[in-house]
């Protein structure tokens, strides 16, 4: 617009004249003054934004500079145009074009630029096509500064904006020292024709604008690797207590109390993960609760050293699609997260989890921003997800949104991917783990791990251990308490064997404890397994690349999901356990990542990239033949086993059937045979003169939870246990009056040995085991070692 340009030039001329007069005045009077910063106008389209989202269905399109959205994306030179107050149509050389969304957001970093004003004409571009009254109609447009709305069209146009609404002139004062400005546009019933433009949009500023792309990743606040694994301990905010002014957690844990409970040898490898849970779903609540805890974490003084040693924190900032009806995390902005990273060294990273069941439009774009921020400040973006609905595939661009994939390609060293084996639908345990390992091996993730969730007992309709029948989701709080303890160790073993190094567990009350006291599951399984992980690092990425022979390329959603592996290395499509470790965790990458990029990352390795739907893999018979040629058979039997250097990792994979399993192995140049009951895992290590045994079969008896039910139908009709009742049960019945199960029997046979072996160095929790017995048969030259225990036991079998 010519008139607007003339006004701007006049302003600059007046400022120049005033500065000349000031210099003359100073010279005449001999006064000492400081130079005044001259304000200038800067068009938003001449700056790079922090991020920009839109509501168009084609997510590969981008927000436009100096053009309306649709013509600009069609490579047309169409100028921005608006209907003015007098009915005339004006064109603009400068401005921004987007499609309204829920909302569409364009974010600028204005920190340090001394911005004093924002000016623009807002409206729906004349290029829009309002073919009916639902199209080219926008609910509202907002200008937001540092999370606060400073302007909204809703005040002037409560029924929204239409194609016929004249351009809205905004000339706003910007608060001093503002850091972020966002332009948000909210779609009406449809997004068709919602061609929102910010015509002639400009800042009046005194300083320089920071280029948001002009930074390099900061030094990491902590290293996470196979040699420095990570245990995440979650604490869930208690919303009802928060409403009463109490910053509290469910289970009556406290931040400091929970941290003190962590053994000193585990502390360097542990973080506390905060979760908003049922905090009131309104603006400011999650931010207030989290910052209160960050302050407490930052100021923590170790009573043993009398030194300030901040408690390491990871914040859950995105869950359930961040839908406002589900989570208070909805109102956590990237600006707020950046502020927390800047203020608190205790903040180690941000966490996203469980979006597969409500995948919203901004999952990928938000994840990209979380990763960028984490890289900028030396933190980690940790994402726990399951491939239900193809969520892993979507994260990497299968639906056309490539923003997260592009961010990972730049900042993969700050990204950790984890599975979350909660859901039953589609059966995606094995496919999700395959994606985790494949993305890790191809440098689309820095590390990987798993969130092992006892809610799976609820999701799959199970009730009392080993009982038949499906009760659906009728007894949630009884069901998550019922998964056998040692099964969590088996699940963690699968991560360890395949190079993963990040561990998290749910339900937190059952897996970790309440009232700042350890649960039996944590004491007997998780703690002992994690100690082993620390002292015996899992395979590194280079080691895993050296032993991996094939990598699947394609999408599991198009290849049967979990059924792809049934009969190969799983028994059923949904299972937390594998039937064999012969092939390892077969890695995969989704086809939304360009094939040439994967091949480039695999160059120099022996790994062959093969399409999931290749004729060589077209059915289970072909798949077995293909992988059997690549990986030799190293043991026999109907039990899971995987060899790692001089160690055998073995477990019974029947997690809800009372069936023993058996396998034969070579160790220390001796033939051995192992028989394990369900929920038992074993590590046998060849130490030349001896074989070290680490065995865990810990399981408590929780039949009292199902008292009164003799079958599934009766179990459904039991009174539902409330959340509070379940947490009280954990403390009163599980922690304080533990009903440890009976000692169970495991048998190890050694063949072709000339004398009876001896048992030495027996360690375990007092009362949880009998000293292993040895029965030697000189005629068959074999020895049978019988172990009776319920828990963790460690001993040596001396054979020479």
Swiss-Prot record:
Q: What does this protein do?
A: Endo-beta-galactosidase capable of releasing both the blood group A trisaccharide (A-Tri; GalNAcalpha1-->3(Fucalpha1-->2)Gal) and B trisaccharide (B-Tri; Galalpha1-->3(Fucalpha1-->2)Gal) glycotopes from blood group A- and B-containing glycoconjugates, respectively.
**Which keywords describe this protein according to UniProt?**
Carbohydrate metabolism, Glycosidase, Hydrolase, Secreted, Signal
Record carries keyword Hydrolase? yes
Would you identify the family this protein belongs to, as annotated?
Answer: Belongs to the glycosyl hydrolase 98 family.
The gene it comes from is eabC
Under Enzyme Commission nomenclature, its number is: 3.2.1.102
Kindly give the InterPro entries that the UniProt entry links to this protein.
Answer: Galactose-bd-like_sf, GH98_C, GH98_central, Glyco_hyd_98_carb-bd, Lyase_8-like_C, NPCBM_sf
Q: What is the protein's name according to its record?
A: Blood-group-substance endo-1,4-beta-galactosidase
Biological-process GO terms, alphabetical: carbohydrate metabolic process
Leader sequence segment? 1-35
Q: Does the keyword Ligase apply?
A: no
Catalytic activity field = Endohydrolysis of (1->4)-beta-D-galactosidic linkages in blood group A and B substances
Cystine pairs:
none
State one molecular function term (GO). Answer: blood-group-substance endo-1,4-beta-galactosidase activity
Q: Which GO terms describe its cellular component?
A: extracellular region
Query: Where is this gene product found?
Result: Secreted
Q: Name one Pfam family in it.
A: Glyco_hydro_98C
**Could you read off the lineage of the organism from its UniProt record?**
Bacteria, Bacillati, Bacillota, Clostridia, Eubacteriales
């Amino acid at each position: 617009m010519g008139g607007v340009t003339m006004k701007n030039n006049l302003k600059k001329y007046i400022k120049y004249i005033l500065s000349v007069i000031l210099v003359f005045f100073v010279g005449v009077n001999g006064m000492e003054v400081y130079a005044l910063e001259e304000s200038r106008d800067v068009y938003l389209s001449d700056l790079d934004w922090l991020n920009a989202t839109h509501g168009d269905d084609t997510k590969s399109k981008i927000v436009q500079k100096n053009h309306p959205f649709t013509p600009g994306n069609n490579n047309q030179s169409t100028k921005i145009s608006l209907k003015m107050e007098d009915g005339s149509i004006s064109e603009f050389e400068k401005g921004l074009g987007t499609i309204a969304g829920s909302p569409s957001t364009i974010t600028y970093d204005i920190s340090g630029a001394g911005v004093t004003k924002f000016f623009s004409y807002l409206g729906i571009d004349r290029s829009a096509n309002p073919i009916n009254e639902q199209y080219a109609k926008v609910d509202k447009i907002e200008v937001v500064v540092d999370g606060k709305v400073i302007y909204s069209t809703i005040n002037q146009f409560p029924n929204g904006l239409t194609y016929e609404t004249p351009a809205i002139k905004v000339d706003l004062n910007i608060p001093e020292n503002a850091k972020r400005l966002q332009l948000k546009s909210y779609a009406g019933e449809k997004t068709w024709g919602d061609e929102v433009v910010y015509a002639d949009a400009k800042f009046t500023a005194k300083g320089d604008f920071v280029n948001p792309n002009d930074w390099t990743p900061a030094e990491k606040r902590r290293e996470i690797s196979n040699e420095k694994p990570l245990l995440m301990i979650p604490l869930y905010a208690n919303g009802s207590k928060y409403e009463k002014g109490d910053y509290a957690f469910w289970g009556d844990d406290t931040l400091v109390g929970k941290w003190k409970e962590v053994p000193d040898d585990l502390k360097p490898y542990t973080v506390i993960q905060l979760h908003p849970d049922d905090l009131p779903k309104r603006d400011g609540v999650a931010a207030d609760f989290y910052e209160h805890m960050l302050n407490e974490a930052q100021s923590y003084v170790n009573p043993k050293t009398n030194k300030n040693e901040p408690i390491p924190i990871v914040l859950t900032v995105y869950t359930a699609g961040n839908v406002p009806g589900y989570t208070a995390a909805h109102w956590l902005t990237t600006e707020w997260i950046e502020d927390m990273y800047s203020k608190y060294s205790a903040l180690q990273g941000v966490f996203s989890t469980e979006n597969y069941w409500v995948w919203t439009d901004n999952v990928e774009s938000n994840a990209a921003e979380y990763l960028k921020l984490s890289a900028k400040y030396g933190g980690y973006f940790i994402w726990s997800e399951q491939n239900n609905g193809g969520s892993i595939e979507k994260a990497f661009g299968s639906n056309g949104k490539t923003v997260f994939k592009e961010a990972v390609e730049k900042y993969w060293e700050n990204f950790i991917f984890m599975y979350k084996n909660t859901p039953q639908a589609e059966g995606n345990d094995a496919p999700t783990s395959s994606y985790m390992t494949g993305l890790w091996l191809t440098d689309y993730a820095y590390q990987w791990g798993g969130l092992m969730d006892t809610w799976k007992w609820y999701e799959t309709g199970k009730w009392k251990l080993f009982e038949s029948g499906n009760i659906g989701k009728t007894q949630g709080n009884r069901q998550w308490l019922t998964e056998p303890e040692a099964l969590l160790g088996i699940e963690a073993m699968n991560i360890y064997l395949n190079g993963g190094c990040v561990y998290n567990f749910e339900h937190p009350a059952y897996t970790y404890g309440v009232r700042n006291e350890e649960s039996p599951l944590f004491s007997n399984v998780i703690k002992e397994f994690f100690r082993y992980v620390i002292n015996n690092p899992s395979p590194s990425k280079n080691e895993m690349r050296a032993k991996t022979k094939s990598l699947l390329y394609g999408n599991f959603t198009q290849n049967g999901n979990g059924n792809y592996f049934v009969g190969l290395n799983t028994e059923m499509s949904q299972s937390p356990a594998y039937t064999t470790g012969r092939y390892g965790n077969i890695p995969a990458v989704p086809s939304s990542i360009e094939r040439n990029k994967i091949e480039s990352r695999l160059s120099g390795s022996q790994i062959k990239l093969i399409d999931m739907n290749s004729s060589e893999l077209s059915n289970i018979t072909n798949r077995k033949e293909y992988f059997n040629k690549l990986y030799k058979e190293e043991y026999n039997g109907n039990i899971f086993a995987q060899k790692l250097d001089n160690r055998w990792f073995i477990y019974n994979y029947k997690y809800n059937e009372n069936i023993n399993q058996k396998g034969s192995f070579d160790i220390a140049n001796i033939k051995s045979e192992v028989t394990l009951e369900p929920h038992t895992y074993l590590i046998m290590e060849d130490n030349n003169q001896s074989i070290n045994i680490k065995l865990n079969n810990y399981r408590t008896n929780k039949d009292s939870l199902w008292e009164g039910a003799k079958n599934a139908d009766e179990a459904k009709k039991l009174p539902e246990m409330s959340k509070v009742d379940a947490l009280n049960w954990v403390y009163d019945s599980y922690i304080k009056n533990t009903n440890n199960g009976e000692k169970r029997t495991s048998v190890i046979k050694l063949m072709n040995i000339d004398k009876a072996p001896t048992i030495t160095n027996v360690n375990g929790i007092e009362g949880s085991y009998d000293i292993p017995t040895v029965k030697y048969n000189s005629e068959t030259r074999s020895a049978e070692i019988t172990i009776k225990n319920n828990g963790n036991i460690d001993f040596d079998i001396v054979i020479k």
